[in-house]
């Protein structure tokens, strides 16, 4: 399967290392880079994480915007300027930069949340609050997911 699924909570050690779930690493196995790209979410107080191929798709979308627009500049700055390449160590861990941990409020635990083509890393209690709100929205908007066939 080529999508990020499920939710996992893993500990963050004193060196800011955290283990990326094995099935997430399996999804990334086809990427050219043995690691992930992480950047601060522009929607939530979490970290968005993806492979190089998804960053390329984001680049293509952003390049459709006027090259001198505020929107393009903001997206390039927030996604590309703040992005970091995180390599996997021999145990499947990455080192989370302090700037990203601060953005997400992560200290001792990290909650990995599969979102299809990306995954997010949250402070666990913050994710539970978001999940409660998302459940309400999904319930209210459930009819927008209609079968296209």
From Swiss-Prot:
Give me the Gene Ontology terms describing cellular component: cytoplasm; nucleoid
SpoVT-AbrB domain segment(s): 7-54, 83-126
Annotated GO biological processes are:
negative regulation of DNA-templated transcription initiation
List, alphabetically, the CDD domains matched: MraZ_C, MraZ_N
User: Which GO molecular-function terms appear in the entry?
Assistant: DNA-binding transcription factor activity; transcription cis-regulatory region binding
Output the PANTHER family linked to this UniProt entry: TRANSCRIPTIONAL REGULATOR MRAZ
Q: What is this protein called?
A: Transcriptional regulator MraZ
Q: Which species does this protein come from?
A: Rickettsia africae (strain ESF-5)
């Amino acid at each position: 399967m080529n999508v990020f699924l499920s939710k996992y909570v893993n500990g963050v050690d004193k060196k800011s290392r955290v283990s990326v779930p094995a099935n997430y690493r399996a999804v990334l196995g086809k990427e050219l880079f043995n690691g992930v790209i992480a950047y601060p979410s522009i929607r939530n107080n979490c970290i968005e994480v993806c492979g190089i191929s998804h960053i390329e798709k984001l680049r293509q979308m952003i390049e459709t915007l006027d090259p001198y627009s505020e929107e393009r500049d903001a997206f390039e700055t927030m996604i590309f300027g703040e992005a970091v390449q995180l390599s996997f160590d021999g145990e499947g861990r990455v080192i989370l930069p302090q700037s990203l941990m601060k953005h997400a409020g992560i200290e001792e635990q990290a909650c990995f949340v599969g979102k299809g083509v990306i995954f997010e890393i949250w402070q666990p209690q913050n994710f539970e609050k978001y999940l409660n709100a998302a459940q309400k929205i999904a319930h209210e908007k459930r009819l927008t997911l209609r079968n296209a066939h």
